[in-house]
Amino acid sequence: MKNGIDVSYCQTKVDWNKVKAAGIDFALIRVGYCYNNGALKIDNMFKSHMAGATAAGIDVGVYLYSYATSTTAAKKAAQEVVKVIKQYTLTYPVCFDIEYESIYTGGSKRVNTDICKAFLDEIEDAGYYAMLYCSKDFLDSYLYPAELTAYDKWIAQYASKCTCPHPYGIWQYTGTGRVSGIAGNVDRDYAYKDYPTIIKGMDKTQLQKQQLPYSVIISGSDLNSLKDQISKKGYFTFMSDGKLCVGKFATVAEANKTAADLKRKGFTGAVGKW
């Protein structure tokens, strides 16, 4: 488990060396927010936070706060984010932050879910590790969790433990944390996956189009080779009823969408939905 924070324009005075010395391993930095049409407004502190955190040796990822009202807008927002972050080396995910705005609470689960998928798919297609941020309640109340199983999640729940029934990789456990080097409150997070290693294993130049060797009946060394190659892309692999299951989560239930997800990335061969 790794200790982290997430920061934005709300944290204007940060001594990143002190933050590092305080035991913070990673920071998720707000790249900005998108308007209803997907246009990006960059956070006033984004560049400063990115420079300070990386100079201090802290792993970094980014998140976008969303006001997107359509899949077209969400895709545009993702494209704008990619333009901004391509100059940086990210070792944590690129996150889509969807919260209790009236456009979502007054909208439909169908539209909200499609907006999330549109952004996350666009980010993944650009070769980045995509993640959905929302609260535990928002996920069940305003989205269709069963349609979001292929995406890792950063769950907000301010409690002594996270009781989200859906798999997640990061838990935001308080909005009033205190860390040496930061004036005032800051969000605190725990990461339960080794994101730097996973992301390092993702070859962005090959992720979008990858041909895997296979046999008509995969077994033995062929199967092991396939498992190894898929694992290097940040997926878990496991056997169920004699079949190779693949996903970003290590359970059968959470692997159901992965065949379509892999095919969209260009994998071909013995990839099927079981």
What feature does the model see in each segment?
Residues 127-141:
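Aromatic-lined carbohydrate-recognition surfaces of secreted/lumenal glycan-active proteins
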Residues 1-17, 21, 25, 146-209:
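Functionally critical loop-and-helix segments that line ligand-binding/catalytic clefts
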Residues 101, 137-140, 159-163, 175-178, ...:
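Short Gly/Pro-enriched loop/turn and capping motifs at secondary-structure junctions
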Residues 1-120, 124-127:
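Substrate-binding cleft of extracellular glycoside hydrolase catalytic domains
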Residues 82-96, 100-102, 143-167, 265-266:
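Structural recognition of alpha->loop->beta junctions
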Residues 60, 129-131, 153, 235-237, ...:
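Hydrophobic anchor at the start of a short beta-strand
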Residues 2, 205-274:
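Acidic/polar low-complexity segments and flexible, solvent-exposed patches
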Residues 64-66, 134, 273:
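Residue-level recognition of beta-strand->loop/alpha-helix junctions
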